[in-house]
Curated annotation (Swiss-Prot):
Organism: Bacillus velezensis (strain DSM 23117 / BGSC 10A6 / LMG 26770 / FZB42) (Bacillus amyloliquefaciens subsp. plantarum)
Domain MTTase N-terminal: 66-184
Subcellular location: Cytoplasm
Gene this chain is encoded by: miaB
Job description of the protein: Catalyzes the methylthiolation of N6-(dimethylallyl)adenosine (i(6)A), leading to the formation of 2-methylthio-N6-(dimethylallyl)adenosine (ms(2)i(6)A) at position 37 in tRNAs that read codons beginning with uridine.
Full protein name: tRNA-2-methylthio-N(6)-dimethylallyladenosine synthase
Enzyme class at the top of the EC tree: transferase
Positions of the UniProt region annotated as Disordered: 1-20
GO cellular component, one term: cytosol
Length: 509
């Protein structure tokens, strides 16, 4: 839904008049509910690009004397969205706070990828109910991917009526209007665009620190894997223009950032929606590598769209890091077909072979789902054998979690939970075994570490990450924070490395 369509739509009441209860009569304010059916549609409307975002004069000062708090769940994209919302809050005059007790506005920026993530949010709403009761003027909002689901909005309406506002992933730029409406309205304000919005540039951001920065390069996903809710909650693929991305990265470099991560639900599809030119992720990376910033990463990749040109560009090295997160999900071609991943085991292994041939020292990590409907013991063994063959540095592993509205949710979940847990344990044992083996290879070596701060467990120890995203803990001066230093590894653990600074030099680049 672009701005014009939004204006034409007006206020929309729930379409389902046969629902258990018709809440539309209670709403005098904005009420645009989500629709997964509408979210499935991929229209041919051209994406509009807006470079003229600004806070309307009527909303300036809205936050004067008020504080905001945002709790973020889920992926890096949500963290990026939180940075944008924080920027809008600050532009409105709000002050950030780290305590819900001090906040005048609390937002939960939610994740819908798995049931466990949603349960955490509903649990948090339960905790915040008492806070809202003691402070009726508190504005409590739910945003992010969960808000795009009809079942979630209906549950909030029925079980958490003290929530003041709900909005989704496509209309973050309308936060000033929604806040104003929430202050004025006696009823819950709901505005969720089921269809994706335009690409809005020049949104304010409050970044977390000055060392590493997120740079969004595209929005949405068109892959429709049968288990995944993201194409519905994030909309169709829309790429930012390359000149906007390059300008943002240059600005971060000039501000002293040492590392940027390019973000997208499927970064490898970048540029496929451009109608006026042929330009992909490889072309963008080839431009960005010329910028004077030490490290550039990207996430998340889809094997189907990982092309040869990108591999050629990454092989040039320099500030383009050879750590690649390449989700496989399963090692069984039959399972991959049921998941609608659009590649098979052989195609994935062929891609891995190309990457390793071009970048022999590349570090590969992955995502794997166990217990997908109809997964047999033999098919699970194929996943284990693929993991051994590739020798991933690490993996995010999950038990299959049905998501309402996805094709897989209609499949019979016929793998017993006991079997799912056994498979997850066996997979995790293998992940730990290979990770420990690969980490052991670092002992005695000197690596470059981007120092992010003090260790969470010991303030006398500094912590940072290597180019291959290995966590390193070491003793060093506090002025090393924010710099890239050389560290000699003395001891390898399963998930981290311990070392000492090599020599007196602090910054190596």
């Amino acid at each position: 839904m672009n701005e014009k369509q939004k204006q034409e739509s007006g206020q929309v009441n729930p379409a389902d008049k046969t629902s258990e209860k018709d809440y539309s009569k209670y709403f005098e304010a904005v009420y645009i509910p989500p629709s997964l059916k509408d979210a499935k549609k991929r229209g041919k409307e051209s994406v509009q690009y807006h470079n003229d975002f600004k806070i309307s004069e009527e909303f300036k000062g809205l936050g004067e004397g008020r504080k905001f708090y945002i709790r973020t769940y889920g992926c890096q994209m949500n963290e990026h969205d939180t940075e944008v919302m924080a920027g809008i809050f600050m532009a409105l005059g709000y002050e950030a706070t780290n305590s819900v007790d001090d906040a005048n506005v609390i937002l939960l920026n939610t994740c819908a990828i798995r049931e466990n993530a949603e349960n955490k949010v509903f649990g948090e709403l339960g905790h915040l109910k008492a806070l809202k009761k003691n402070n009726p003027d508190l504005i409590l909002g739910v945003c992010g991917c969960m808000s795009q689901e009809e079942s979630v909005v209906n549950r909030i309406l029925k079980k958490h009526p003290f929530v003041d506002m709900i909005f989704g992933t496509h209309n973050i730029h309308r936060l000033p209007e929604l806040l104003s409406e929430a202050y004025l309205s006696k009823e819950m304000v709901i505005e969720v665009w089921s269809k994706e919005g335009d690409v809005i540039e020049n949104l304010p951001k409050v970044r977390n620190g000055k060392i590493k920065g997120w740079v969004n390069i595209m929005y949405g996903c068109d892959k429709f894997c049968t288990y995944c809710i993201v194409p519905y909650t994030r909309g169709k693929e829309r790429s930012r223009r390359p000149e906007e991305i390059i300008q943002e990265v240059r600005r971060l470099a000039s501000e002293g950032y040492k590392e940027i991560t390019l973000l997208g639900q499927n970064v490898n599809a970048y540029g496929k929606d451009f109608e006026d030119m042929t330009y992909g992720l490889g072309d963008l990376m080839d431009e960005l590598r010329k910028i004077d910033i030490p490290r550039i990463r990207f996430t998340t990749s889809h094997p189907r769209d990982f092309d040869d040109h990108l591999i050629e560009v990454l092989a040039k090295g320099g500030n383009l890091l050879d750590h690649i997160h390449l989700p496989v999900q399963s090692g069984s071609s039959a399972m991959l077909k049921m998941m609608a991943r659009k590649y098979d085991r052989e195609r994935y292994l062929e891609l891995v072979g190309k990457i390793k041939a071009a970048m022999p020292n590349a570090s590969l990590t992955t995502d794997i789902i166990v217990g997908f409907p109809n997964e047999t013991d033999e098919q699970f063994e194929e996943t284990l054998s693929l993991y051994r063959e590739v020798e991933f540095d690490s993996a995010y592993t999950f038990i299959y979690s049905p998501r309402e509205g996805t094709p897989a949710a209609k499949m019979k979940d016929n793998v017993p939970m006991r079997v799912k847990k056994e498979r997850l344990q066996r997979l995790n044992d293998l992940v730990k075994e290979i990770s420990a083996k690969k980490m052991k290879e670092y002992e005695g070596r000197t690596v470059e570490v981007l120092v992010e701060g003090e260790s969470k467990n010991n303030p006398d120890i500094l912590a940072g990450y290597t180019e291959k995203s290995k966590l390193v803990n070491f003793k060093g001066p506090k002025d090393a924070i924010g710099k890239i230093v050389r560290v000699k590894i003395e001891q390898a653990k399963t998930w981290s490395l311990d070392g000492v600074m090599a020599g007196e030099a602090i910054e190596v680049k």
